[in-house]
């Protein structure tokens, strides 16, 4: 076909890869919700969901049908435009953040020279979704949850950024593929161990996952900024949270554990196995740890995480200058 030029073919292939990768991420986020319930049941000596389909295999389908047919109710006292916009921002910001993650040497959505900065920007955008939801709901518990979430997320994003600067300094680039290539012989988790620990803790906090789920603590503030949401709007918040877990897990693999590098197995298999391991760790943390007070969470961040990241960055700079 005369209109199908090599340039157009390359564009179509790139767009096709992007669509496939993002659909897989959404699917992983959805399946993780079911896998989490099964694993929590295993950890706690329960059966978990096992009634729908063989061994509970169709539970996710049943949940999707239930959510589709639930009334998507918008209370009269809300700011309807902002109330509707908030879950869309929460979902898309975490999904777009995954775009900079290289899965294999040839598969990825966007190869940006400012990859890490792009992730930090998308993570910051997710704060607006929480603020919009809390303010537009016109509910005291929702607003309190939004204030908690914004303060917690902004604080721990500082520690995420500082923990990644050591990796950037070692690789000499913000590009994610360059960072993966720099780990061909030695994973960053060894020279940047304290940076990894801080990134892992801050990643859990930014995802609002247990034990850092104070913004939506059911026992304290009745699910926080989610309180007035139902139907598919709540579903976007729900799936967006799990997409955030997938994204943070993939970033840990890419930045600290060599990305797709590994012996014998194909690159995609190594990337999937490493990412799946960290997704399981999110679930194990939820099953194992209690929820601290909100002031303890903020105090831990500024009094423990910040000094560790600064010392790690200073040590990295000293080593680089010494080797130079």
Curated annotation (Swiss-Prot):
InterPro entries: NADH_UbQ_OxRdtase_su1/FPO, NADH_UbQ_OxRdtase_su1_CS. One of its GO terms (molecular function) is NADH dehydrogenase activity. One of its GO terms (cellular component) is plasma membrane. Keywords: Cell inner membrane, Cell membrane, Membrane, NAD, Quinone, Translocase, Transmembrane, Transmembrane helix, Ubiquinone. Its EC number is 7.1.1.-. It is found in: Cell inner membrane. It is an enzyme of class 7 (translocase). It holds the Pfam family NADHdh. It is a multi-pass membrane protein. It catalyses: a quinone + NADH + 5 H(+)(in) = a quinol + NAD(+) + 4 H(+)(out). The chain crosses the membrane at residues 11-31, 81-101, 114-134, 154-174, 186-206, 237-257, 264-284, 304-324. GO terms for biological process: aerobic respiration. Belongs to the complex I subunit 1 family. NDH-1 shuttles electrons from NADH, via FMN and iron-sulfur (Fe-S) centers, to quinones in the respiratory chain. The immediate electron acceptor for the enzyme in this species is believed to be ubiquinone. Couples the redox reaction to proton translocation (for every two electrons transferred, four hydrogen ions are translocated across the cytoplasmic membrane), and thus conserves the redox energy in a proton gradient. This subunit may bind ubiquinone. NDH-1 is composed of 13 different subunits. Subunits NuoA, H, J, K, L, M, N constitute the membrane sector of the complex. This is NADH-quinone oxidoreductase subunit H. It comes from Pectobacterium carotovorum subsp. carotovorum (strain PC1). The gene is nuoH.
